[in-house]
């Protein structure tokens, strides 16, 4: 094959998006309702009794963090299940033996997972705008961070789906690592509110940089520089791309 097989990419992509449509309650409605409850409790109820954070009302302040929380978890979940299920049923071998390159397989699965996550993020954003006062100072960068993060962590989910040898392992890393890092990464607070020691410790949490950059696109303020946030996100992307390339080069947990 001399070029990209767009027909194959489109076929896999459409299949994954169709699965998203069949599981709409679980894939879209449930995360939106769960996040909306955070907005109601922390934003509308508790937020009215709290001081502004860096001049931003608390309800609006937590919006980027909560969107990022859903974006990270759903990107990983969508991509990991998308590639794990063919492994579980054995159809992955038909895919690997078909005239489809590894780049096309990755592009289709990761593209579908990222599309679902971006759609979810935009729906949550629209829901938040109804519940709390909200403004976006840098719409271009907001969309850029949204898409870049969705693609990056869809790659992470793809890796987890290949690595997992059971359904329980699909949730292992998201539950034990991603969710705690997101909650401790400034979703509900600014790390500047922490004592100096814990502020320094927080800088070792990579999710801090993702949330900080995304929050900057909304309010123009951030815990770390926007360049550092963008650099960390791109670093994640490069690392995950390298791991995916290694997986296909070695056939790790793909070849019988």
Question: What spans do the regions from the language model cover?
Answer:
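Hydrophobic transmembrane alpha-helices and immediately adjacent juxtamembrane helices
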Residues: 1-139, 144-256
